[in-house]
Regions:
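Membrane-embedded helix-loop-helix hairpins and adjacent transmembrane boundary segments
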Residues: 1-450
């Protein structure tokens, strides 16, 4: 539940009040509707705009793949599908996403956001209540968790591993600040009152949905086991081809045991609705960013027909690569999402935040953040997640260090890139040249900042 609380407070409430007004006023004043466009105009650099557009397109792909992966696990559980069946579900969802975005566009995405929000609020409360009730109530469920280990830490306030829990909170809460959707979200806000309403609604929604989801996940050990000799009614979690337990199947297994068939159907609708909203948003963000920020400035007579054609091509490419990655069952949902957010927010968080508050923020500092965010992500992925035999010695050495912070975790790597971005940008900006004074003053004039 701490992750859900962090998502609500750090990921929803604080951004609205801390950067909502500034992001809205500045992005509208300089007419920046996307994150790459913001970097290009705020820092007077077309190269930054191009680089950030490419980063957005490339690293939204694993995020999209993680959504497909989750859907395939859930549908596989509900309909008892094998590996081939799960792959078919991924492909069908990709086709559905493409049709939905192409035919419906932004209006369909917005309408679906509203409808799926209502479904999620109702559904998550029901699912959480039944998950706990199945184990004789909250107190009995917590006591059962405590009894599973000698120290009882599974039922403690901060869980068995609070240090690595902090990494999850940072990645999923602070990480949202640097995602490319942030500029679009605040650009579209009409006035100051809308900021207050948005802060309240999004925070309450995050507490219920994110808090409820993580709260439910805390009881997964009562429904699943990794021990093949366990004779209880717990679901056995098999080992994947990479030798690691397939953790992505745990929550579907929990739902299968805790819920009646009717409510499992509700969960399918719930997740499908939420996933369709997320997928359509990601596809639109990626394809429109690359089209408007990379292609449009370089092509003459780029009319609406050409723009739509190019966007559809990018949508097809984006979804195709996402499906290929999602079909690789060795890539877990958390790993895909961690590397995506680690690269995106690790690259963009510092430049975006300081671009709103610090007049001396420099293009060079942005480049440093881009290179470190993307570079650390790629290096960590190659060393610890791709199972490259040449790096097995490095993995063993890190394992033998006995560090309480899991250095092999892509979640912690992503959290590290975000914190590093916040540290590096002001340091590098202190000894590198800021953009032209007139352009900086013009950008900040909308904020009445002297």
């Amino acid at each position: 539940s701490w992750v859900g609380i962090g998502n609500a407070i750090i990921g929803s409430l604080i951004p609205f009040f801390l950067i909502g007004r500034r992001a809205r006023l500045m992005s509208n004043h300089i007419d920046a509707r996307t994150m790459p466009d913001f970097f290009g105009k705020r820092f007077d650099s077309s190269a930054l705009k191009t680089a950030s557009a490419l980063i957005v397109f490339v690293f939204l792909i694993p995020y999209t793949a993680s959504v497909y992966n989750g859907l395939s696990r859930l549908f596989g559980m509900v309909f008892d599908l094998g590996e081939n069946g799960a792959t078919i579900i991924i492909i069908l969802m990709a086709v559905l996403s493409a049709l939905y975005v192409t035919l419906g566009g932004y209006k369909a995405t917005a309408l679906n956001d509203f409808v799926q929000g209502i479904i999620m609020l109702i559904g998550i409360g029901t699912v959480v209540a039944l998950t706990v009730q199945k184990k004789n109530g909250f107190s009995a469920a917590v006591d059962s968790l405590k009894s599973m280990t000698e120290d009882g830490k599974l039922g403690s306030l901060f869980g068995p591993d609070p240090i690595n829990l902090l990494g999850v909170v940072i990645l999923t809460s602070l990480g949202t600040w640097g995602l490319p959707q942030m500029v679009q979200k605040f650009y579209a806000i009409k006035d100051e009152q809308a900021i207050k309403k948005g802060a309240i609604i999004s925070t309450l929604f995050a507490i219920v949905v994110a808090g409820g989801s993580y709260f439910m996940g805390g009881f997964v050990r009562l429904y699943c086991t990794l021990d093949p000799a366990d004779t209880s009614d717990k679901a056995f979690i098999e080992t994947g081809a990479n030798g690691k337990p397939v953790f992505d199947t745990m929550v579907p297994a929990l739902l299968h045991q805790a819920l009646p068939n009717l409510l499992i159907g509700l969960v399918v609708v719930l997740v499908l609705s939420a996933s369709l909203s997320t997928l359509s948003s990601l596809v639109l963000t990626s394809s429109s960013t690359l089209t408007n920020d990379l292609i449009r400035p370089r092509v003459k007579n780029f009319d609406d027909k050409k723009q739509m054609l190019v966007m559809r091509i990018f949508i097809a490419v984006f979804l195709l690569i996402s499906v290929i990655i999602a079909c690789n069952k060795n890539a877990s949902i958390s790993t895909l999402m961690s590397y995506s957010w680690g690269a995106l927010s690790g690259a963009f968080l510092g430049p975006f935040l300081y671009g709103l508050f610090l007049k001396k923020a420099s293009p060079a500092a942005c480049w440093v953040s881009f290179f470190t965010g993307v570079g650390i992500t790629i290096i960590h992925m190659m060393l610890f997640s791709l199972n490259i035999s040449a790096f097995s010695g490095v993995v063993q050495t890190v394992n033998d260090m006995g560090c309480p912070l899991n250095l092999l975790s892509p979640i912690n790597a992503g959290a590290f890139t975000m914190i590093l971005s916040l540290i590096l940008v002001p340091i590098v900006s202190s000894f590198t040249k800021a953009p032209d004074d007139k352009k900086v003053e013009d950008a900040f004039s909308s904020l009445n900042v002297k």
